[in-house]
Amino acid sequence: MPYTGRENYPYYQEELASPSALWSDLYALTMAQALWEDGRHNAQATFHGFIRTAPYDGQYLLTAGQNIVLEWMDKNWKFDEADIYTLAKKTITGPDGKEHKLFKPEFLEMLKNSQLDLTIDAMPEGELAFPAEPIFRVNGPLWQGLMVEAAILNTVNSQSNFATYASHLKTAAGGAPVLEFGLRRAQAVGGLSSTRGAFVGGADISSNVWAERCYDIPTKGTMAHAFIMCYEDELTAFKAWAKGMPYNGIFLVDTYDTLHGVENAINVCKENGLHLSGIRLDSGDLSYLSKEARKLLDAAGFGEAKITASNDLDRATINALKQDGAKIDYWTVGTALVTAKEQPGLGGVYKIGAVFDEKITAKEVDAMRDAVREGKKSPDEIRQHARELMKLSGDAIKMSYPGELDVVRYLKSGENGQLYFDGGTILSNWQEDPIKYKD
């Protein structure tokens, strides 16, 4: 499934999809052996991945990570010799105090020879999802559906969390460019997960060059305070920058005195006939300084120069600065975005919805689903062959919906608010508007 939410986004050289089939919690394997021993491991089953509540006090989730999961399943889901060795050496202490092998050799042989036989339906990345709507639907052998749970949740929870917060930042910025400059604060080596999720969610630019290599995410960067401080004074540093980077005329102006730094940037560009692309403010009263800097830039004839703000920005500070009339064109967000500081965890879950009789083969189930997609059968006919499953709980939000679930979405169009079927952004067995089959 290619990512369609952003133009020219590449199908992956996926650095994040490199683990083997052991990208899983151990209990998936212990359940798999118990099912295998009972002869039920290949029963056809259906699972759904979804959220229970929307993050950030909002109403939606901006989904991301689906392509990573699909790439991993397509290219790397297999048990190699190192995987089998890891499992073969696991032991458990029995009631007799002796160590026993956790996994049987015959079961490990089954794993070694297995190929992934799951059918995955998913919303496209960048699509909005709402609580209880399946983002993923997984059909196939019961044991394999259990095996991929952790990888799906690990990926889609984190990616969607970053993407959703980035979308909220973009809204707070009023559509102005949002720059993800948080690599040094990211909580994973390489920072790929947060940078990628932020880009899917609407961040325009990153500082992470590794992410550009892997995903072609555009990067930008100028100077740090260290560059300025290693020269005798700010003006000398700016002259050196202008000489070495004549087409990258963005100056960090707050190392010593911010407004004097703006004047130095103006003078250097005027003296050298350079285009002053912009300045960056990284400390102090960003609202006041941006307004004063704007006056200086406009008076000097650099009305097109952009003002970029940084310094631990988040959704609240951006909103406050916007309300105060700050003259900021670009918003640079680091820590708050790459750590999902407002809500570090997303509680997406993965639940079983149906299981078929072991005598019904995958080929037979696929034929039934194909008939539904072609409009020859209703989904009700599939339900006749499956045992629909529902998790019960005293906590209503933890109850799950039974059966094979679709997401059928209708959008309002025009002044009259006429509803129309949106077939391009759904997770459904239907290729056409299902309302026509409702009778």
Model-derived features: positions:
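Ordered alpha/beta subdomains of enzyme catalytic regions
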Residues: 1-245, 259, 275, 350-439
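Structured core elements
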Residues: 48-50, 119, 136-137, 180, ...
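Short beta-strand/loop segments at the ligand-binding rim of alpha/beta enzyme cores
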Residues: 113-115, 175, 296-310, 327-328
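Glycine-rich beta-to-alpha transition loops that act as phosphate-gripper elements at the mouths
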Residues: 123, 183-184, 307-315, 334-336
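Glycine- and Gly-Pro-enriched alpha-helical subdomains that act as flexible
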Residues: 218-307
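Short, charged, surface-exposed secondary-structure boundary motifs
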Residues: 231, 288-291, 317, 339-347
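Catalytic cores of alpha/beta
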Residues: 260, 264-268, 313-327
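Glycine-rich phosphate-binding active-site loops on the catalytic face of alpha/beta enzymes
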Residues: 327-345
